[in-house]
Design a protein with these regions (language model features):
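Active-site core segments that coordinate phosphate-bearing ligands/cofactors
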Residues: 1-118
Length: 118
């Protein structure tokens, strides 16, 4: 068994909802995220709020969000951060895929992932 760990998923979601004062469970944020064009916000996010685990293992890495403007919204920032998380998961997968058999199974865990409707 091979794997790669990240600390970004649920931690980024919880941090962004708290800091950006987004509602917890009304569904409006999720609807706005789903309706938004991928990368339509013009932001770039490095979601390393707790350092980086896979693939570089840089514990001192920190998050960054660039491209902010007067029209940037809280959901834009959350979307950019979550896209950064997805990019990180893709990077882990790219590293692991050559080591796996052609009929491999990807297993993802975590509270936020388990509660996600999609």
């Amino acid at each position: 068994m091979v794997g790669g760990a990240t600390s970004e998923g649920g931690n980024v979601w919880a941090w962004a909802r708290r800091v950006l004062a987004l509602p917890e469970r009304d569904g409006a944020v999720e609807e706005a995220l789903a309706a938004a064009e991928p990368d339509g916000h013009g932001l770039t996010a490095l979601p390393f709020l707790a350092g980086e685990r896979s693939t570089g293992w840089h514990e001192d890495a920190r998050a960054a969000l660039t491209g902010l403007g007067l029209a940037t919204t809280a959901p834009d920032m959350l979307r950019a951060l979550l896209e950064g998380v997805a990019f990180r998961l893709g990077a882990v997968y790219e590293r692991l895929a050559p080591l796996a058999s052609s009929d491999h199974t990807v297993v993802a865990t975590g509270g936020a992932l388990a509660r996600s409707p999609t």
